[in-house]
A protein has these predicted regions:
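Bacterial N-terminal signal peptides
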Residues: 1-9
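Central antiparallel beta-sheet cores of small beta-barrel/beta-sandwich binding domains
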Residues: 15-116
Length: 117
């Protein structure tokens, strides 16, 4: 009697490690901007904070493979402005697009300054 062993095929998508302290630079329609970002990662979920001259703001996001999405909200003339960063991680860099609510979008480059311990 011939027995067949069936092993289910499981595709495992490894998530890039994006935890650490980042310097993010944007080129958007209103000019150039820069923020410092601390990202904590648990599986595919991201949390942390964004710091710029206007203050400190909580962030949330996800990572899938080498695709990263980070979102935070800042007060802009009394109304909240949601900023979304979509990019691909390449080693110690993230390159992609920043979307500033309905104001516009532009390119971004982020560089990891240090990793979380």
């Amino acid at each position: 009697m011939l027995a067949l062993l069936l092993v289910p095929s499981v595709s495992v998508l490894a998530h890039a490690d994006v935890s650490g302290n980042w310097r993010v630079e944007f080129t958007v329609p209103s000019g150039e901007m820069a923020v410092n970002m601390t990202i904590n990662q648990k599986g595919d979920a991201l949390s942390g904070r964004v710091v710029n001259e206007d203050g400190e703001f909580p962030l949330k996001g996800t990572v899938s493979g080498d695709d990263v999405t980070v979102v935070w909200t800042v007060p802009e003339r009394g109304a909240p402005l949601e900023i979304t960063m979509n990019g691909k991680i390449e080693g110690e860099y993230i390159n992609g697009i920043a979307r500033l609510g309905n104001v516009g979008e532009g390119s971004l480059t982020a560089r990891r300054m240090s990793r979380n311990p």
